[in-house]
Amino acid sequence: MTAHDADWSDRDVSGALVPGEGDIDVSLRPRSLREFIGQPRVREQLQLVIEGAKNRGGTPDHILLSGPPGLGKTSLAMIIAAELGSSLRVTSGPALERAGDLAAMLSNLVEHDVLFIDEIHRIARPAEEMLYLAMEDFRVDVVVGKGPGATSIPLEVAPFTLVGATTRSGALTGPLRDRFGFTAHMDFYEPAELQQVLARSAGILGIELGAEAAEEIARRSRGTPRIANRLLRRVRDFAEVRADGVITRDVAKAALAVYDVDELGLDRLDRAVLTALTRSFGGGPVGVSTLAVAVGEEAATVEEVCEPFLVRAGMVARTPRGRVATAQAWTHLGMVPPAGAAGLGQPGLFD
């Protein structure tokens, strides 16, 4: 691992799941739709899908959950299985490299099981094509042998519900997307919703969290429950070591300053991207690959981890010619925006 990798690999404000925190995250997961905070529209729709299937005594349509990481897609998959009283089988798109990998998993399903495929947009094409038939007709054709002597053997699959999760719904092929009977897009959380998430998590973890402190952490959590819970744990560490264990607003502010999370929830990598965009490229436009090289990161990391929040926060604008720093980005970095900065003189355009 390089020094640079050490800097960014454990970002507290990344929506990605950090190794070693899985057990804690499991304890904080809601176990029913009633416990799930936020996403009211999605919850209502899922409730109808689940109750309708239970009333008919059948399996629900296949379900696709899309949205940025850390919003609760995996939790909802677990809840769907629990609400149906079914077993949950879990895998991921990258793990299904061959059709045989998927066939083995499908053959072990029993009726009404829920199969959860995370990052389904990354499933290999042979496995995806096998999935088409399994989703529609609950059977798969397994090819035995090679060349002219190859034989296709049909295998029945127990009726099941597929729950797919993706952070890039546009990367799904049309045939796969069309086979989902219900699609839900999950939105970023409002600060008030994140305060509820933090209050619930604090209760489970036995943390004394003041209302003002919860508001402070929620405001810097980038609209993402996973980040809110992660920051809560880091602030707890600070409170136990450098304070009396009680998390007040001042303690939360001091802790978040130590972890380089600023008032808007930006961390060092976010600020590095903005700094490169403004100082090295004069505000842009600049391509994401060039921008990634400037900060020493992979283009995918900049595009999938940093950029969504920076765009949503009104700091970066995506244009046909590349990424452009808005007037708000210049101001946030303590610089005077140039006359041509995006959004300058257009109040509310990026609010």
Curated annotation (Swiss-Prot):
Supply one GO BP term.
DNA recombination
- For the ligand (Mg(2+)), the binding residues are 74
Region annotation (Large ATPase domain (RuvB-L)) ranges: 1-189
> Binding residues for ATP, per the UniProt record?
28-29, 70, 73-75, 136-138, 179, 189, 226
- Keyword terms, alphabetized: ATP-binding, Cytoplasm, DNA damage, DNA recombination, DNA repair, DNA-binding, Hydrolase, Nucleotide-binding
Assembly notes: Homohexamer. Forms an RuvA(8)-RuvB(12)-Holliday junction (HJ) complex. HJ DNA is sandwiched between 2 RuvA tetramers; dsDNA enters through RuvA and exits via RuvB. An RuvB hexamer assembles on each DNA strand where it exits the tetramer. Each RuvB hexamer is contacted by two RuvA subunits (via domain III) on 2 adjacent RuvB subunits; this complex drives branch migration. In the full resolvosome a probable DNA-RuvA(4)-RuvB(12)-RuvC(2) complex forms which resolves the HJ.
Quote the entry's note on domains: Has 3 domains, the large (RuvB-L) and small ATPase (RuvB-S) domains and the C-terminal head (RuvB-H) domain. The head domain binds DNA, while the ATPase domains jointly bind ATP, ADP or are empty depending on the state of the subunit in the translocation cycle. During a single DNA translocation step the structure of each domain remains the same, but their relative positions change.
Name recorded for this polypeptide: Holliday junction branch migration complex subunit RuvB
What is the taxonomic lineage of the source species? Answer: Bacteria, Bacillati, Actinomycetota, Actinomycetes, Mycobacteriales
Q: Which gene encodes it?
A: ruvB
